[in-house]
């Protein structure tokens, strides 16, 4: 009987292969952990590391299984690429925290890598939303300009609102993108300060660098999440088919909880709740605070893996008729050309704005109103409302983005607007034709 394990039917054997590899890893890792416990005197530090390792072994397979399913059913790259990047956050966080818990001396280095990936996740979530909208609604700027003016949320409610349309879209994307620049920059500064001995992580004092970097990171992160929230508020109806609330909460909770619990632990050290009287096997109080943070993250990531399994499910992308290469799906996961293009676009937009040449609005605010322009304006807005009120896609498929769009079933605002425009011009010409005939 010929072997069926060929590259053409890789979907059938890739999942059993991953399961076998994971089981072998468990068989090797568990004895090593037991041997480590027997070799050392078991204390609080070692017990915490062992318990965190149990949660790590529970977390990794859940996350990797969802990632693998997305690779197997990689039918809509525009959406699944950012989803896969977001899903990698849980195993990276969990493994990073477990290593830092075991080796406190290198915690500063592995934790900074984890925090950089946090910014990367926020950027990819914004990319996930914009990719869906631009594929389903090609004239997204047109839709934004037709909407009512959105005011800022507190505490920015006193600031003038951003103009609807391209300005709002650009500033929301730029607000998220700035965090992906600020966070790696502050991470490099933190590493330099650690080498110079002036970082002093976990100690709230204006004589060290850690306090200032925490403030900068916090402000940048809050503004990025604010831009995400404002973007969702404006396009809530258009985003409803992909159920973004659960996805937004998953990203927001992981990012905010990990950050603020570090701040709370640092405050406990500052007020003396965590003191030098009980450092266990750690050398300093700050090392105790960092170890406690890493231990809690290992537990939280198990819960986050379960939440990601349901909120970022692969099931809407299952299309058995779609065949793809195993290597193409795997390599696409590491492709970052979209990030390069997005950064280039934002830089060009900033350059146009600085030079005073922004793009013209599709709906000018100051224009002479007459019967013809009013009719065209109302017709265009009707076209937008028609496209925006399209029924949600059937279960199991997200219609309207990627290569699943079919012109016969998914009309775009551009086509509808052209049809209305041609009909309007035709009606305008009818009286003149009749006068000629008479």
Swiss-Prot record:
The chain crosses the membrane at residues 17-37, 48-68, 86-106, 179-199, 212-232, 254-274, 287-307. Residues 355-438 are annotated as: Disordered. Widely expressed with higher expression in lung, kidney, spleen, pancreas, thymus, prostate, testis, ovary, small intestine and thyroid. It is found in: Membrane. It is a multi-pass membrane protein. It holds the Pfam family Solute_trans_a. The keyword Transmembrane helix applies. The modification Phosphoserine is found at residue 422. It comes from the Eukaryota. Residues 374-390, 404-413 have a biased composition (Low complexity). Keywords: Membrane, Phosphoprotein, Transmembrane, Transmembrane helix. Residues 425-438 have a biased composition (Basic and acidic residues). GO terms for molecular function: transmembrane transporter activity. One of its GO terms (cellular component) is membrane. Belongs to the TMEM184 family. Possible tumor suppressor which may play a role in cell growth. This is Transmembrane protein 184C.
């Amino acid at each position: 009987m010929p072997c069926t394990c060929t590259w053409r039917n890789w979907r059938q054997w890739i999942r059993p292969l991953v399961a076998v590899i994971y089981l072998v890893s468990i068989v090797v890792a568990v004895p090593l952990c037991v041997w480590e416990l027997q070799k050392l005197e078991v204390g609080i530090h070692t017990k915490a590391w062992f318990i965190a390792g149990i949660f790590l072994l529970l977390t990794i397979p859940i996350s990797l299984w969802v990632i693998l399913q997305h690779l197997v059913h990689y039918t809509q790259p525009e959406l699944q690429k950012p989803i896969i990047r977001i899903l990698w956050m849980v195993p990276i966080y969990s493994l990073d925290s477990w290593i830092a818990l075991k080796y406190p001396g290198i915690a500063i280095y592995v934790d900074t890598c984890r925090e950089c990936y946090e910014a990367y996740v926020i950027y990819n979530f914004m990319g996930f939303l914009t990719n869906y909208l631009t594929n389903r609604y090609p004239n997204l700027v047109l839709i934004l300009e037709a909407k009512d003016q959105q005011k800022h949320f507190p505490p920015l409610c006193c600031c003038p609102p951003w103009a609807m349309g391209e300005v709002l879209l650009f500033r929301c994307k730029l607000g998220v993108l700035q965090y992906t620049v600020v966070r790696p920059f502050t991470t490099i500064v933190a590493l330099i300060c650690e080498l110079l001995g002036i970082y002093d992580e976990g100690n709230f004092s204006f004589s060290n660098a850690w306090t200032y970097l925490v403030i900068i990171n916090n402000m940048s992160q809050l503004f990025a999440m604010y831009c995400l929230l404002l973007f969702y508020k404006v396009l809530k109806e258009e985003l409803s088919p992909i159920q973004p609330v659960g996805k937004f909460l998953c990203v927001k909770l992981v990012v905010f909880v990990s950050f603020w619990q570090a701040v709370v632990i640092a405050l406990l050290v500052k007020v003396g709740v965590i003191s030098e009287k009980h450092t266990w096997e750690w050398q300093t109080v700050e090392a105790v605070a960092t170890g406690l943070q890493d231990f809690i993250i290992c537990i939280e990531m198990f819960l986050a893996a379960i939440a990601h399994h349901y909120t970022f499910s692969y099931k809407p992308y299952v299309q058995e008729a779609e065949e793809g290469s195993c290597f193409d799906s795997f390599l696409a996961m590491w492709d970052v050309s979209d990030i390069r293009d997005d950064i280039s676009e934002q830089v060009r937009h900033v350059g146009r704005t600085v030079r005073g040449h922004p793009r013209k609005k599709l709906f000018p605010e100051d224009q002479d109103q007459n019967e013809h322009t009013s009719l065209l304006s109302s017709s265009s807005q009707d076209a937008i409302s028609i496209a925006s009120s399209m029924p949600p896609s059937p279960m199991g498929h997200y219609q309207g983005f990627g290569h699943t769009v079919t012109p016969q079933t998914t009309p775009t605002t551009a086509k509808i607007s052209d049809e209305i425009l041609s009909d309007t011009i035709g009606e305008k010409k009818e009286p003149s034709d009749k006068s000629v005939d008479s």
